[in-house]
């Protein structure tokens, strides 16, 4: 019985790994990220279940990271970070007075960084360029926006201030709506100006995101075009 369970578990891990290592997984991740970045904020504003959905989706994205690499070291780091993240979320949503909101989001940022690194590795492996790889580049861009939103949550939780202007922040998960909006506006260098950075750390984060937003497409597109032309 134990051997049977172990065999089934190993098979499940192999199946998940073969899916997340394949190019087709880029599309699945894109759908998950579009939901997390563009659709969820709308759901969070109109429904009480939005926060739970957001947490489930965020954890699902990071969970997929465990299976998106063959490197044992990266699998271990992803799995450990995911486990800590999940535990801290469960503690916060459980019936107890404990909450590690800042630590939780710091772990979330570390998780996002590892996942971005894993995705960049997937993107440039075996020097092939196809539609899926372009989708993969979009995924990394959206992951940067997500990371920016988590960083804003940390700044706000640690300092009590982050964004000013046409915005009311509650200090809870609901603030994600404003943070992802500001993060995307900074990353795309649009900067609508209705919401703006108040303290220095938020200002530096906004300019850092803008710098990434300008450099990332230039570097990644140049690399993909270079690979495509060298193959032809």
Q: Which ranges hold each PLM region?
A:
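Pore-domain transmembrane helices of cation channels
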Residues: 115-161
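Outer-pore turret/helix-boundary of cation channels
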Residues: 43-46, 56, 147-181
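Cytoplasmic-side transmembrane-helix entry/capping segments in multi-pass membrane proteins
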Residues: 73-84, 101-109, 131-139
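N-terminal membrane topogenic signal
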Residues: 14-30
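Membrane-embedded alpha-helical segments in integral membrane proteins
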Residues: 11, 30-44, 60-63, 85-93
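Short, hydrophobic transmembrane alpha-helix segments
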Residues: 38-51, 65-73, 94-95
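Structural signature of hydrophobic alpha-helical transmembrane segments
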Residues: 44-58, 101-111, 177-180
């Amino acid at each position: 019985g134990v051997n049977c369970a172990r065999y089934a578990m190993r098979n499940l891990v192999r199946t998940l790994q073969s899916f997340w290592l394949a190019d087709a997984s880029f599309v699945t991740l894109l759908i998950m990220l579009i939901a997390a970045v563009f659709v969820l904020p709308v759901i969070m504003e109109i429904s009480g279940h939005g926060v739970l959905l957001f947490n489930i989706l965020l954890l699902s994205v990071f969970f997929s990271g465990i299976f998106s690499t063959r490197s044992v070291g990266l699998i271990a780091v992803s799995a450990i970070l995911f486990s800590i993240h999940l535990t801290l979320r469960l503690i916060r949503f459980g019936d107890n007075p404990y909450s590690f909101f800042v630590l939780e989001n710091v772990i979330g940022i570390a998780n996002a960084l590892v996942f971005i690194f894993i995705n960049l590795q997937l993107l440039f492996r075996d020097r092939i360029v196809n539609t899926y790889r372009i989708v993969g580049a979009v995924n990394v861009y959206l992951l940067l926006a997500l990371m920016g939103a988590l960083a804003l949550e940390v700044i706000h939780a640690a300092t009590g201030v982050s964004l000013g202007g046409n915005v009311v922040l509650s200090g809870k998960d609901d603030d994600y709506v404003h943070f992802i909006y500001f993060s995307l506006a900074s990353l795309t260098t649009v900067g609508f100006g209705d919401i703006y950075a108040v303290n220095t750390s938020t200002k530096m984060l906004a300019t850092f995101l803008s710098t990434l937003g300008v450099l990332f497409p230039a570097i990644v597109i140049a690399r993909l075009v270079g690979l495509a032309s060298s193959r032809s």
